[in-house]
Amino acid sequence: MEKNKFIKQILTIFVIILEFILFNYSFYNLVTKNYINNYGKGMQEKSINIESYLPFKDDSLIVHESSAIKIVDNIPQIDGATALYPIYSAYVEALYPKESVKYDGKDFLKDSKIQKTGTTVAYQRVIDGETDIIFCAKPSKKQLEYAESKNVELELVPIGKEAFVFIVNKNNNINSLSIEQIKDIYTGKIVNWNQVGGENKPIIALQRSEGSGSQTAMLSFMNGIEMKKSSQSFIGGKIGYSFRYYVESIVNDGNIKMLSINGIEPNIENIRNDKYPIVDNFYMIYRKDNTNENIEKIKKFVLSEKGQKIIEDTGYVSVNGY
């Protein structure tokens, strides 16, 4: 009897576990998987493939440009934002010797003169004096406060222009929002797509990580207006934000689309003529107290016709209009 009772208990536990597994599998396929796939990988963090844009590589996707300026001694280390890596990788190829780039097949070695740590880490590294030059969007309030706490002043040299964009699923019937509508979505005043002419579906307003270039741009866009926290709901239609080049060339996901703002598309022409309402500069950044004389040479090349052509041919808009 005791043995039969024990067997029944084991079978009951097994059935409960099996039901739990089946429930979770069904939930994943019906809800979670749909939530992830229906709106595309573009809403998730995605990094650029280092090797695809590696300098001194024959099949690299970078713009190959020559330079009369060659830096062979006291070479400044360069780092920066993921989305700008194709630009500063091209600068390294144009200006630096091949042996200055050290790559192990997965990542750059510590003593390589080019790194790709991303905006947040790159700002910390340049402020701490661990790298010489970074290419990024403007610093966040916290990054500026960190620099001030270290008694560091940063030099920000504008080198190009880029559109800050909002992205949704390609099947969302909304193609344009006003600036006020976007602000109302992110403050929680607008909570359903039907409030802006879309389907009767809750809006899931996503945010990026603190200190990233996109989050800093979003905080600047909101201009001090507090945003509600990102929704954790499984049901609804997502909206997110990033920079145009990152969405088009790095994420490159056919399941998402960029919204027009006030009826104006975020394309190259509208960025160049400042018709698109959310355009900002990106920068070459270094410490003002950095005494490396080669920084000025790099800046001169970056702002030259060839340096600005690299920006244009990569897919951005140059600040000097070349």
Roles of regions detected by a PLM:
Residues E2-E148, V152-E162, V168-Y322:
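Exported/periplasmic ABC-transporter solute-binding proteins
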